[in-house]
Amino acid sequence: GVQTCALPILGLDSVRQFQVVTSGGQAEFGRASGGFVNVLTKSGTNEWHGDLFGYLRNRHLNAANALSGTALPLTQSQYGASLGGPVVRDRTFLFTNFEQRIQNQAGLIAIAPSSVAAVNARLDAVGYAGPRISTGLYSNPVRLWSYLGKIDHRFRGDDQFTVRYNTYDTWSRNQRGAGGLSAASASSDLDNRDHTIVASYIRTLSPRTQNEVRGQMGYSDLKAPPSDLTGPAVSIS
């Protein structure tokens, strides 16, 4: 199955704190009977501050795959930036974060060469006009983008309003259904974009009492078109 709702996936540098509750959650977290993880995002402060980071994994440093006996051509680069600070000192604060991952990788089809030859011979016999199947490596590139923008505003007193927008974009080819005993022509691509908007207003009624109103809207646009419209969908069991 696949997800049926937009899930906020955050960049590494936008996370301020993790809260892990194994049981006995408060009412604000709904009717969850088990444990849950609450992720708190960063906010701007009265000082402008930014970060840059980068990560690179090169295919020449990979170990050999146990099935193919050769190193899979995996190259991954991941980088991002964040910036936060005051729009109006002591009142309004901005925080923003961007992250991207570029992953050039390959999957492995382990169909025996004799089975590949038998399937292709059958396709030839019936006059199939599409491409033939193959074994070995197939391309599986992945691109991920994440963006977060957050504004906090403090009213006079201790009241506070927060609005946050987050988008997460995924692009991948031959993402689902290929590998092992399934040919690459049996796979589907993945084009997915999630949008999430969260707003909250905290009203301080007394030194011991607060009231919070919170709302969220999520939208997910998930597409999984076939990777190969003309190739045979071969899966051996």
Model-based region annotation:
Residues 29-31, 72-76, 139-143, 155, ...:
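Short sequence motifs at beta-strands and strand-loop junctions characteristic
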Residues 14, 44-48, 77, 90-94, ...:
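Outer-envelope beta-barrel architecture signal
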Residues 33-35, 77-81, 145-149, 193-199, ...:
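Hydrophobic, lipid-facing positions within transmembrane beta-strands of outer-membrane proteins
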Residues 50-54, 83, 96, 163, ...:
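Membrane-embedded beta-strand positions of outer-membrane beta-barrel proteins
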Residues 10-55, 63, 78-91:
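A beta-strand signature from Gram-negative outer-membrane beta-barrel systems
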Residues 24, 54-60, 69, 100-104, ...:
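Transmembrane beta-strands of outer-membrane beta-barrel pores
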Residues 1-7:
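Short, small-residue-biased leader/transition segments that mark boundaries at the very start
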